[in-house]
């Protein structure tokens, strides 16, 4: 994955019976990472596509892409979609 000039949504997927708790825990660490790294303009939340799946998403301005990519998101999508 490489940075883009548009805001991007990065996603980390979690599966199984503990997926929701794991995703909530990851979200807390993601928010702490923003503060520690001085990142601004990021938004994040949780989503679920089906039973046994939860994901953390992070909408990132282009200036924060490189820092977020260090966290190895599983997928990404254009924020305009």
Could you say what each language-model-derived stretch is?
Residues 2, 6, 60-61, 72:
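Intrinsic-disorder/low-complexity coil detector
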Residues 26-30, 66-77:
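Short amphipathic alpha-helices in soluble, non-transmembrane regions
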Residues 16-19, 54, 61-64, 79-80:
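Short, structured coil/loop segments at alpha-helix boundaries
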Residues 39-40, 73-81:
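Conserved short beta-strand edge segments in small beta-sheet-based binding/regulatory domains
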Residues 2-36:
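N-terminal acidic leader/helix
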Residues 38-70:
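Short, intrinsically disordered low-complexity segments
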